Design a protein with these regions (language model features):
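Active-site helix/loop module of the DD-peptidase/beta-lactamase fold
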Residues: 67, 72-76, 88-131, 150, ...
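Active-site Gly/Thr loop motif
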Residues: 199-221, 225-228, 258-318, 349, ...
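Flexible glycine/proline-enriched surface loops and loop-helix/loop-strand junctions
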Residues: 65-68, 151-157, 167-169, 211-219, ...
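Active-site SXXK
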Residues: 34, 48, 54, 71-97, ...
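Short, gly/Ser/Thr-rich active-site loops of penicillin-recognizing serine hydrolases
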Residues: 326-374
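Active-site-proximal alpha-helical segments within enzyme catalytic domains
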Residues: 119-122, 167-174, 219-243, 252-254, ...
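A short, well-structured edge-of-sheet supersecondary motif
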Residues: 35-66, 96, 134, 138, ...
Length: 374
């Protein structure tokens, strides 16, 4: 606290004397790493935005990128989908432990006991080889889910971590049956309207402007988004679920989502860049404290788009790029490290807390599809 006071006092004195205060964060390494990433991988551009509990501290576009740049985000879609389901859970329309059989009684007996929690943590036992229906035209989400459920299980549910998108497709279809609404309608009501998203939908390959509907959205990897939109998402997560002082989600729900589901489980299938990390619900667990509580989460995509939230440090970041994510991953990790290092010296000035340790708060105020509280 004493050091924080000295830092703030020095800045105020410099301002009063007409001398420019030293920037609170030196992000020159991050800027250099961003430029190097673009050059090394022949990217058309890149966008980087960083924030702390006090607000945005850095936003930069390189090359052809700008505020309107919209890209497919691949597996960063998983985090959006998980947050969408979390809204339904808090509204009482779903539970994380709801089994498949409650919504698909016609499914084979072997899969009826699989829960939404397992479907969204890659522990369902469903095979990871991509189902053909994920990319099929003229197929609905319901039809795709039934096709996936009809296949033999690769592992016993809850016994193995195996990364893949098939299981999340089933969870999305369960949400449709639970609410009686399409995934598009759910997403528009639970994410787009209350968060003020203007460039995010589930048609990754589309070139049209606006929100383009999709009868069979790829729940685990089919979204496209912008720097501004995803920044709103990670700002909400960093703030423990708050949006402009009102509860979008509770800290308890975010803590449940961030809990590592891979502990004690054999790893049957995982991206080669993520073998040392855990997994929660739609998000990777990148760091933990000495007690094992999650302190940093992320959801990088195959094309390089990388969002993260670090509760211990009180910071978040979104890197928007489109290229070969596997080839870029080492350089992206170095860029993320440069960002975290730049924000680290002043972490005591931030006020964000891990959602596992929520402070006292008033009863949650839920935002509806129009942004009104109720």
């Amino acid at each position: 606290m004493r050091r924080s006071s000295l830092v703030l006092a020095a800045a105020l004195l410099a301002f009063a004397a007409g001398v420019p205060a030293r920037p609170l964060h030196d992000l020159s390494r991050a800027d250099t790493a961003t430029d190097a990433l673009v050059a090394a991988h022949g990217l058309p551009g890149a966008s980087l935005r960083l924030a702390t509990g006090a607000g945005e501290v850095h936003r930069r576009h390189v090359g052809s990128h700008g505020e309107a740049t919209r890209v497919p985000i691949a597996s960063a879609s998983k985090w959006l989908s998980a947050l969408t389901l979390a809204r339904l859970v808090e509204a009482g329309e779903l539970r994380w432990d709801d089994p498949v059989g409650d919504y698909f009684p016609e499914a084979p007996a072997a899969v009826r006991g699989i829960t939404i929690d397992q479907l969204f943590s890659h522990t369902s036992g469903i095979a990871t080889e991509e189902a053909a229906c994920l990319s099929a035209r003229g197929v609905t989400l319901q039809q795709c889910a039934l096709e996936i459920l009809a296949q033999p299980l690769a592992w016993a549910p809850g016994n193995v971590f195996a990364y893949g998108g098939n299981s999340m497709q089933v969870a999305g279809a369960m949400a449709e049956r639970a609410t009686g609404r399409s995934w598009d309608a759910i997403f528009l009501a639970e994410m787009v309207a209350p968060l003020g998203l203007t460039g995010t939908d589930w048609t990754a390959a589309a070139l049209r402007e606006g929100y383009v509907p999709n009868a069979n959205p790829r729940i685990a990897g089919g979204a496209r988004s912008t720097l501004a939109d995803y920044s709103r998402v990670v700002d909400m997560v960093l703030a423990g679920g708050d949006v402009a002082g009102e509860a979008f989600l509770s800290p308890q729900t975010l803590a449940v989502m961030a809990r590592d589901r891979t502990l004690g489980l054999p790893i049957a299938d995982s991206p080669d860049t993520r073998t040392d990390q855990g997994y929660g619900l739609g998000q990777w667990v990148e760091a933990r404290d000495v007690h094992g509580a999650t302190t940093r989460v992320s959801s990088p995509g195959a094309f390089g788009f990388t969002p993260w939230v670090d509760w211990r440090q009180g910071s978040n970041g979104v890197l928007l790029v489109q290229g070969n994510g596997r080839a870029m991953r080492e350089d992206i990790n170095a860029l993320q490290r440069a960002c975290l290092d730049a924000l680290e010296p002043v972490r005591e000035l931030q006020h964000a807390s891990p959602p596992a340790l929520p402070g006292p708060r008033a009863a949650p105020v839920r935002l509806d599809a129009t942004g009104r509280a109720h």
